[in-house]
């Protein structure tokens, strides 16, 4: 079974007024590409901010309390995560399905989606899981989170090289 996704063109209309359609390409629209890039960068920035504030900065009072920026870094990171999940969901409707069925860039795209799912699951485990699993889950979340941007970059580079061939 072949999936056909069609988009109206601005060319002439058929004789009955129905718009002509052309196949939708593999490349997502600009708003989706920018949304993915912006949300991944926001996740990386807020996650890195939390790591710096949590491990390198202490509260000015010196009583061992977390730095005042720490909860704000987590809040912003959570907001960025919700945006990223929404954007990834919008990508799954066309780009991910078409790419998977066309067997194009499965390794890089699948790795990116797997990393995103692992991040979502580890975030849930950090929020709702037992304290005994918090430290290893946290390290897993950092490592996979720091790998998300290189995975996205790799997926884009592979797709662009393949498009030139």
Residue spans of the language-model regions?
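Membrane-embedded alpha-helical bundles that constitute the cytochrome b-like, heme-associated redox core
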Residues: 2-165
